[in-house]
Amino acid sequence: MVKQIVRDIFFLGQPSEPATKADIQIGKDLQDTLQANRERCVGMAANMIGVRKNIIIVNMGFIDVVMFNSVIVSKHDMYETEEGCLSLDGVRRTTRYQEIEVEYYDFNWKKQRQKLSGWTAQICQHEIDHLSGKII
């Protein structure tokens, strides 16, 4: 189901709680909401649709991947960039890493480990920041 985008900075600044198998529908809601906002958005965190759970969706270029309880386990090659966010107006400077490795659970609750680089790594880092209440 397509959900409204949350723009409340206080809510977005709160850390998320771990997701459980019972939260699978939230992942589906993220898929629907990202699809509805495709022209202006490449990733989302569950708190952006009003749910403080550790769930994100990242556009990988050819597919959108939902990640439950995602954690960055390694990162390399720091750089400065500017980013926008559907929950905020304008762009802001931030620091990201060119390459990351992330662990997460998929829709089947199978643990995954994936190496990401470039734009996809940047999207993933932005969304994982949302989970800890960090807003660019």
Predicted ranges, named:
Residues 1-136:
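Positively charged
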